[in-house]
From Swiss-Prot:
Intrachain S-S bonds: C18-C68, C22-C43, C29-C50, C33-C52
Compartment annotation: Secreted
Keywords, alphabetical: Antibiotic, Antimicrobial, Disulfide bond, Secreted, Signal
Signal peptide extent: 1-5
Record-given protein name: Antimicrobial peptide MeuNaTxbeta-4
Molecular-function GO terms, alphabetical: sodium channel inhibitor activity; toxin activity
An annotated GO BP: defense response to bacterium
GO cellular component, one term: extracellular region
UniProt KW GTP-binding keyword: no
Tissue-level expression: Expressed by the venom gland.
UniProt similarity note: Belongs to the long (4 C-C) scorpion toxin superfamily. Sodium channel inhibitor family.
Limits of the LCN-type CS-alpha/beta domain: 7-69
Amino acid sequence: LIGVKTEHGYLLDKYTGCKVWCVINNESCNGECKRRGGYYGYCYFWKLACFCQGARKSELWHYETNKCNGRM
């Protein structure tokens, strides 16, 4: 059995390098999170970004490797 380490964080828009944005749509974030291997996603309203639990690290936005250029 091989385990894959999962994490929690904001979903990464791989095209822009930014967080995947949202307004109040938990369904959209939850669906996107699950498509990326997570188990639950929601729109974190204060950051206007999709937060995902249980996704692979490569699917998540990280401050240290931020390539968004201040857009979000």
